[in-house]
C-alpha cells in the first residue's frame, strides 16, 4: 500500500500546489471493491475555503481519470485538516511541539499501541511524548496514525 500511497501523492501534489494550496497529506484505503481517497489540503495565511476544496476535487478527479491509478470505483474526499488535524510527516510533528497529540502505533511499544500526551519534541527521528509523569521516545516509523488533540 505504501507504493500506491507514494504514487497517489506524486500525482496529486503538483495539482494541489498549482491551486495555491499545500497537500497536507492523504489517506488511501480499500474496502471490498471500493476505494476511498481522502485528501487534506492547507492554505496560508487564511486557511482553506470550501471553494478551495471544490477546485482541488475537480482538478484531482480529472487527473485520476486520465492517469487511472485507482482501479474500480472510488470515493474522493477533499477537506482541510481541521482542528484535530492528522500528522503525516515528521515535519508536521515539529510544527506541533507543545500541543497534545494522540498516536496509534503499528505494533505495541512497551505493551501499548495507543498514546495521548504532550508532544515535547523530536530527537533523532523519534517523537518525544509526555504521558502523565512518563516520557516516551516513540520511533516515527512505528506510528500508524497521529492527530492533534484540540484543547478548549
UniProtKB/Swiss-Prot annotation:
GO terms for cellular component: cytosol. Keywords: Cytoplasm, Ribosome biogenesis. This is Ribosome maturation factor RimP. The keyword Cytoplasm applies. The keyword Aminoacyl-tRNA synthetase does not apply. It comes from Teredinibacter turnerae (strain ATCC 39867 / T7901). Required for maturation of 30S ribosomal subunits. GO terms for biological process: ribosomal small subunit assembly; translation. NCBIfam families: PRK00092.1-1. InterPro entries: Ribosome_maturation_RimP (IPR003728), RimP_C (IPR028998), RimP_C_sf (IPR036847), RimP_N (IPR028989), RimP_N_sf (IPR035956). Its main location: cytoplasm. Belongs to the RimP family. It is found in: Cytoplasm.
